[in-house]
Amino acid sequence: MPILSKIWAAPAAGILRKTPRNAHQMRLISMTSSMKAKVFNSAEEAVKDIPDNAKLLVGGFGLCGIPENLIQAITKTGQKGLTCVSNNAGVDNWGLGLLLQTRQIKKMISSYVGENGEFARQYLSGELELEFTPQGTLAERIRAAGAGVPAFYTPTGYGTQIQEGGAPIKYSKTEKGKIEVASKAKETRQFNGINYVMEEAIWGDFALIKAWRADTLGNIQFRHAAGNFNNPMCKASKCTIVEVEEIVEPGVIAPNDVHIPSIYCHRLVLGKNYKKPIERPMFAHEGPIKPSTSAAGKSREIIAARAALEFTDGMYANLGIGIPTLAPNYIPNGFTVHLQSENGIIGVGPYPRKGTEDADLINAGKEPITLLKGASIVGSDESFAMIRGSHMDITVLGALQCSQFGDLANWMIPGKLVKGMGGAMDLVSAPGARVIVVMEHVSKNGEPKILEHCELPLTGKGVISRIITDMAVFDVDTKNGLTLIEVRKDLTVDDIKKLTACKFEISENLKPMGQAPLNQG
């Protein structure tokens, strides 16, 4: 009988008596006992010692993979003055939106405000501090902390307010639109002719994590896309609290199936009564896809049908939210495009049929999706590593404004519209990235969106490769400006000149604007 088995089978007095011979085994028993003590009886018990003014890393992407029970527990335990580091803050009445409603959050460090109206209201009215951080940079700052790296260089955000400073962190409560606290400029350095920004790691006092299941030692598994920011955040706090849907005995989760090893898990809670709402429910069309009948819808379809011609068989592409998500409707049968979603999915498939949706499987627009055969799923840090590392063949995204030299603005209208940059800054800043902007040629007010210089805060400087609108297609040279290469068949070059607020060259091979056919298969 092995020595450990004899000790475990011995009377209590024998277990407690430490001798030189059994000292090592006693340490193992002590460790095993303390590891099993990780399991807390309730979420409230697990979070009750979090102090006021703590910095919390809170996992999730939209409402996918958020620690529902732990967040609700904090609304009951009542901590104040919290700094929350999270990709976004859920919605008004769920996720971190609950802590915003109870005024328990003093500051957010996020990449995206999204559809949370209360988040935007508190920020614009000076009630809440907000440090905008590009999504990939946020993931890497967290990952770096867990890996013991104090700072790193990234191309993301160079030439924007994120690097140059001046982004509003806090507005005045008394003077509408007045910036009370602005971000500071960051150190830059050039490597191999490319400009980089230095970013510092983000440590948390506590991390609030949602996983699928764990064993009693704290080895954890995520399910589908619910790993997202939970993955790197597990490793970057002094105390990581994990809530799961199932707790099993050690050994049930095979070693190769462990996503986060027990060394990173300090407290474990069995979650209850999960709601798992889907932020933007979308479902597969029943029957043929019908063309839009509205003017706005027709414009979007024209843009998407042209954007689809940018795809080549076998390429890896990232599509932004909005118009870019329509482009796959025009990919022909037998044509493979590996769609990457910034929340960690490679191989995004179509919307699910109603009734088959899975809240743990969403895209960057927080819509339910399916997976194609051969798909894979990674954490947010790995997702942006492949973006920042220039592994994407193409990025297609929308814009508020573009300049003639390829500058892009699509994340903020100061004092008015607050969405955040999300992953856009990372996507357009990757060295050598091919960036296709898709947008209406003019705003709702009829004002040109292609300008000499962007008037809004930049998402990227000199980053656009091609602009596709509902009227024309331009190639972009970051030194020489725009060249008109295609015009919609019912328009003339003069029409384009009237609605474009900058000069442009006209290609010798100017042709009618291409349109991919709608795939009804």
Swiss-Prot record:
Mostly located where?
Answer: mitochondrion
Write down the superkingdom of origin: Eukaryota
> Which catalytic residues are annotated?
E342 (5-glutamyl coenzyme a thioester intermediate)
From the UniProt record, which GO molecular function terms apply? succinyl-CoA:3-oxo-acid CoA-transferase activity
A Pfam family reported for this protein in Swiss-Prot or TrEMBL: CoA_trans
Q: Name one GO cellular component term.
A: mitochondrion
Q: Where in the cell is it found?
A: Mitochondrion
Known role: Key enzyme for ketone body catabolism. Transfers the CoA moiety from succinate to acetoacetate. Formation of the enzyme-CoA intermediate proceeds via an unstable anhydride species formed between the carboxylate groups of the enzyme and substrate.
Could you tell me which NCBIfam families the record lists for this protein?
Answer: pcaI_scoA_fam (TIGR02429), pcaJ_scoB_fam (TIGR02428)
**According to its UniProt record, which protein family does this protein belong to?**
Belongs to the 3-oxoacid CoA-transferase family.
What is the protein name stated in its UniProt record? Answer: Probable succinyl-CoA:3-ketoacid coenzyme A transferase, mitochondrial
